[in-house]
Amino acid sequence: MESYDLAIIGTGSGNSLLDDRYARKRVAICEQGTFGGTCLNVGCIPTKMFVYAAEVAETIRSAARYGIDAHIDRVRWDDIVSRVFGRIDPIAIGGEDYRRAQPNVDVYDTHTRFAAVQDDGRYLLRTDDGEEFTAEQVVIAAGARAEVPPAILDCGVRYYTSDDIMRIPQLPKHLVIVGGGFVACEFAHIFSALGVRITMVIRGGALLRHLDDTLSRRFTRIAASKWEVRSHRNILGSHENRSGIVLELDDGSDLQADAVLVATGRRSNADRLDADTAGIAMDDRRIVVDEYQRTSARNVFALGDVSSPYELKHVANHEARVVQRNLLCGWDDTKAMVATDHRYVPAAVFTDPQIAYVGLTENEAVAKGFDVSCKIQHYADVAYGWATEDTVGIVKLISDSKTGQLLGAHIMGHQASSIIQPLIQAMTFGLTVHEMARGQYWIHPALPEVIENALLGLSD
């Protein structure tokens, strides 16, 4: 039986752990899927490459408002897919080849789970092929998977998730998307911009309900002007007919589609690891970790979607850096360890309009007892907004009027994910609203002036 110093389950952010400090350690890497994990292969990176193609198409369609006549001759879906995965697939293949070539690393390419804890404290792991090995330390970075409602899963109809929709053989004429979160809205934007009719089926009354209410309501209105949104609806069943797929809704109606994308959330893969056999605690279907990313089992760490509620690649990368350092410390030596910092975790939704946010929503700030001040500034209020003829972009800032501290920032509009960065810095380093507004130059007439004006509105 092989014996290792370290076993890593998952090759998303977990694959970034090994640097020169681990060159003398024997390492087992366990990956049943494609090397690189969700973000590289079926998540953040390929979706944003599709989003960019969608934005090019939208720019052409809207060119007339700027005095330029243009039209789209054809959408070459095969070429779009080839452009994306012609870049992505070699990276995944190269990553696996690189690890396999390292003399201190063995790669196990079938599903791996915990088997038992040995008398000496080492962990026994077993693959679905029946191979067994032990490791002194284990890092669980097994990610998450798309969750499919039983009403669709049990009917046997063909459906897509974010794992495979980007490789659909051809563009459907009508795509029904089940779900109203960030994955659903990004794919609605992509396929709509490429000429596909979109219908969204959502259980609640609004899209992107995790956002601040102002942005969620505003985005839902914008989306409803472009896509059909069936709100307050559940799927009871589905079947196929000669025309495609039929979804049966709880109001008695049927919804005909050429293709169905299920985007109703993701579930941690923690339940597939037999973690309890190793004494690893779970809560709300995720592995429980402390601020050092330690699990309840000695010498076992976890990171990323398998243990984090954020489901964001930049969070997983941050946690990987923490684990990378803490693996080299004694298990109880917290003075030598570093802790994760999840105080101000930003996120973005790459739909149209783009959305970015960090910190508290207005409702959350009120619930926490802050003396809340809010300012909403429109893109149309600044010169760059005039240049782009923007009518939808807004910045909403939330502060504590007693201390001047920024509590939350919520942006909807062009390049929201880029222009929010100085606000993330302000919150992280404790700058007040007034210091942020007046302590630096703001380039005129650049788009970040909309942030400057919002800050000034709070500091007056």
What does each of the following model-derived ranges do?
Residues 2, 41-42, 46-132, 211-237, ...:
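N-terminal Rossmann-like dinucleotide/flavin-binding domain of flavoprotein oxidoreductases
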Residues 44, 142-197, 229, 276-296:
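Glycine-rich dinucleotide-binding loop and its adjacent helix/turn
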Residues 155-172, 254-334:
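FAD-site-proximal beta/loop scaffold in flavoenzymes
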Residues 2-4, 127-137, 250-259, 296-297:
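Core beta-strand elements of the Rossmann-like FAD/NAD(P) dinucleotide-binding domain
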Residues 89-92, 166, 172-176, 182-246, ...:
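Rossmann-like dinucleotide-binding cores of NAD(P)H-dependent redox enzymes
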Residues 4-33, 38, 45, 49-56, ...:
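Flexible, glycine-rich terminal cap/loop adjacent to redox cofactors
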Residues 8-15, 34-35, 146, 166, ...:
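Residue-level detector of alpha-helix initiation sites
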